[in-house]
Swiss-Prot record:
Protein name stated in the entry: Elongation factor Tu
Catalytic activity, reaction form: GTP + H2O = GDP + phosphate + H(+)
Enzyme Commission (EC) number: 3.6.5.3
Domain of life: Bacteria
Positions of the tr-type G domain: 10-217
Residues the record lists as binding GTP: 19-26, 81-85, 136-139
Protein's cellular compartments: Cytoplasm
Pfam families associated with the record: GTP_EFTU, GTP_EFTU_D2, GTP_EFTU_D3
Predominant subcellular localization, coarse grouping: cytoplasm
Region (G3) residue spans: 81-84
G5: region residues: 184-186
Gene that this sequence comes from: tuf
Similarity comment: family membership: Belongs to the TRAFAC class translation factor GTPase superfamily. Classic translation factor GTPase family. EF-Tu/EF-1A subfamily.
Chain residue ranges for the region called G2: 60-64
Amino acid sequence: MAKSKFERNKPHVNVGTIGHVDHGKTTLTAALTRVCAEVFGGTAVAFDGIDNAPEERERGITISTSHVEYDSPTRHYAHVDCPGHADYVKNMITGAAQMDGAILVCGATDGPMPQTREHILLSRQVGVPYIVVFLNKSDLLADDCGGADSEEYAEMLELVEMELRDLLSEYDFPGDDTPIIPGSALMALKGEDDNEMGTTAVRKLVETLDTYIPDPERAIDGAFLMPIEDVFSIQGRGTVVTGRVERGIIKIQEEVEIVGIVDTTKTTCTGVEMFRKLLDEGRAGENCGILLRGTKREDVQRGQVLAKPGSITPHTQFEAEVYVLGKDEGGRHTPFFKGYRPQFYFRTTDVTGACSLPEGVEMVMPGDNIQMTVELIHPIAMDEGLRFAIREGGRTVGAGVVAKILK
């Protein structure tokens, strides 16, 4: 059989399931593949195929993640599901699986639980822009209340919904406007649909993903940004900086800023080359060399970025959500305390920074995740959502994401 060609005619959207342990994230993931395969074509993936998540290494951290895909009439979804809570923490902080939107799975019989809250907080910290709620096990709640058309069931459902909306609002998500879909993932997985809680509910969830999560901005549509990896001077032509374009497009004769470490300067791109060929432009994802007019070799260094003027600014102080590697992951063997000064590796370079811990936290153990405030000794070009590694002498001991810029 010929290998099927990957159709690029639909927008590609990254989603994932989040929520408390045993509320049904993996069952829902399997149900989504089954329902979409049946209704819109594609391949169903069994529960076991998702639950045995392969281990991956991301920035030196071992994470177990399952990746599945499914289609709606208008989109192609790539979906991540993690077996354990620690895997979610690592996944979201390292950005190993960046989500354009998350499906928060909450058991209707339990209501919001500690990890429900923690995953909403993590989503806020790492910049997951949209959350849709699937209120799972609604069939069990209906059984407990004397049926899906009983008054008690309607009241209980409303209570859980209110709790969830309050929780979402607490972390600056639009709780009142968040879609909440009651249903049963297990029913949908088995192909059942009593009281429209199975297949119908999961179809409704897919329709909600289609309408509530907007098409993500593609890297190429962003404001031009290229982290500088190397600097050369070419006799008679000037200074060339090389790197991989992170987002946007750079054209010849466009003005750019050199941002980070020292004061921001302006210059003009007078040439773009790739594999020794001269081009009119450099695009997101491409490794290229950019010739800069009137810029001296010593005015530019690795760790700075080349960017569209005004699109990014340098900062030294920020709040971060950090995961500290466990001893078995090659991390530290001992805790660290406030005033800890490791290197923070942003894009292409290490910068020393001092850590302040939240009130009441004396020390941080290997394997913890923590919110901390960091003050760098040099400014770095950053946006909220930028990922970094924490290193000691070139060895990764943690991973983090900029949650809020302070200065």
